[in-house]
A protein has these predicted regions:
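Ankyrin repeat boundary/linker residues
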Residues: 22-23, 56, 89-90, 123
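Start-of-repeat signature of ankyrin repeats
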Residues: 26, 59, 92-93, 126
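Conserved hydrophobic site in ankyrin repeats
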Residues: 20, 45, 78, 112, ...
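Ankyrin-repeat-protein effector appendages
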Residues: 1-11, 115, 124-127, 131-150
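Intrinsically disordered, low-complexity regulatory segments in ankyrin-centric signaling systems
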Residues: 1-36, 40-43, 47, 147-150
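Ankyrin-repeat inter-repeat connecting loop/turn
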Residues: 16-19, 52, 85, 119
Length: 150
């Protein structure tokens, strides 16, 4: 184990002996490493057979966390390892694609689409990634129009 990975595990209260297990705060290392954009740690954890189906307290998987971090290396490693690209969280029903589209992460959306993410899945409120991406663009235009009237 590389020293920087050992340090990361220890600094985040994970077991060096059992690095894929969650810490005392009920956080999985794969999700935290993905959220922090630590592709080196993500790859290490995947090599240690980290479970791909773990979720955080909101029901999001590691792919969602990597999309949040806007980190293509983490996203690619997780997809290559076989993470559920279309996982829908229990709270809203959103997928990583829906999240990425709703927050304007164009590069991430492209990466997820290239990997085969399902564009027809909907949130519990009946929104698709396209619906939320369109809403985001409209809000951007509204903001521009309001500012031009000042």
């Amino acid at each position: 184990m590389k020293p920087e990975i050992r340090d990361w595990l220890q600094n985040n209260y994970f077991s060096v002996a059992q690095p894929v297990l969650k810490n005392g705060a009920d956080i999985y290392p794969l999700i935290l490493a993905s959220q922090q954009g630590r592709a080196d740690v993500v790859r290490f954890l995947l090599e240690q057979d980290a479970a791909l189906d773990v979720v955080d307290q909101y029901g999001n998987n590691a792919l969602w966390a990597a999309c949040y971090a806007d980190n293509s290396d983490c996203i690619g490693a997780l997809i290559h390892a076989g993470v559920d690209i279309d996982h829908q969280n229990a709270v809203s029903g959103a997928t990583a694609l829906i999240f990425a589209a709703s927050t304007g992460r164009e590069k991430v959306v492209g990466q997820l689409l290239a990997a085969g993410a399902d564009t027809t899945l909907k949130t519990h409120d009946d929104f698709t990634a396209l619906d939320l991406a369109a809403t985001r663009k409209i809000l951007k235009l509204l903001s521009m129009l309001v500012k031009s009237g000042d």
